[in-house]
Amino acid sequence: MKWKLFYFFTLLTFTPAYFFIEQNQWVILASFLVIVNLISLTVHWKFGLLLISCSAALLAYCQLMPEFQLAKLMKANWLRTPFISWLDQHTSGVFNQYLKLFLINETTKNTLYQSAIQLNIVHLFVISGFHLSFLFGVMERWLYKRFYINKITGFVMLLLYLFLVGFAFSALRVFVSKLLRQMFPKQLPENNLGLTALLIILMSPGALHNFGFNFSFLACFVLFAINKVKLWKPLQAVLTSTLILIVVSPITLHLNRKLNALSVFHNLLFTPIALFYFCASWLLLPLIPWMGNSLVGFYWPLPWLSQWALNTTVFLNLPKPNWVFYLVYYGLWGLLYTVGTVFYYDRSLWCRYWVNSPAVKPTAQPSRL
């Protein structure tokens, strides 16, 4: 069991690093990593040695190359730049903004995006792992399966979409995770997610203080936890949305400085709407050269719905948490998830201490004659 969840435990070690880097708490970050590494040495020297190496690499990357981010380097590439030029040539105004938001993750000067931030549902209106997982799942299920044509086509489409969205971290997570799953089919999902995160961090340490990166991985941990319990589908959807919003609420509060009290309701309401417009926006592309901005009416429900949600919701104005709260909050969640995961994958673990404990021989009862 010690090595079964190796990458998962390694990822949990670095989760709080996001908050320390965000607030430039370098001394605290270094102290935290030293303490964790010393504890890991008591588990196994190889495990501790690798964690120490990862810690040193993390600090060196963040200090020497703070501006190195994969997403920034890939914003202008052979596919994304011509596509943006084509959209700018045939569309303009609000229609242009909606297409860029739903198709290529472009969020600048977009009122719908700003409304989604205030409603704490911004993850639904940008290209995320949710959308790409849906795309890959459709191809894997419905395309021709012989000679792995469905999987090869799915990976090609994911790679093209990565270039199109500028290698957004949430999209990169899906590509790396799916690739690792094909290479190591017996790997535990927690290990797959942990290794995916560590590989992305090595490619771009700036991911540690990127909202999309942290939201994507924290949401996946919640999904893994909920999927281990058999529940009624509607109840599972509500519970999943609730837990995700609870787990990511400190990050949302850090970004927005207020929380939407009706986040769960809005999340359930806008999820099918966002998925519909994600698919429909691609279907509109062939019509754009002939119809142009006249297609903007297709999106008219979105500003109306977002404005209605803003007018009817209740916002909780809370103070911005400090690093102590982040450490305690995510430390407790990490501990709870770790204990639950170990128990789920190795239920006999808790019994071993009882089995290996010193045997107590029952005292002979005096015979009664």
UniProtKB/Swiss-Prot annotation:
One Pfam assignment: Competence
Membrane topology: Multi-pass membrane protein
Localization per Swiss-Prot or TrEMBL: Cell membrane
Keyword terms of this UniProt record: Cell membrane, Membrane, Transmembrane, Transmembrane helix
Bilayer-spanning residue ranges: 25-45, 47-67, 119-139, 152-172, 206-226, 235-255, 268-288, 295-315, 323-343
Domain of life: Bacteria
Gene Ontology CC annotations of this record: plasma membrane
Cell membrane recorded as keyword: yes
Parts forming coiled coils: none
NCBIfam families the record matches: ComEC_N-term
Protein family according to the UniProt entry: To B.subtilis ComEC.
Listed name of the protein: Uncharacterized protein MG316 homolog
Organism the protein comes from: Mycoplasma pneumoniae (strain ATCC 29342 / M129 / Subtype 1) (Mycoplasmoides pneumoniae)
Lineage: Bacteria, Bacillati, Mycoplasmatota, Mycoplasmoidales, Mycoplasmoidaceae
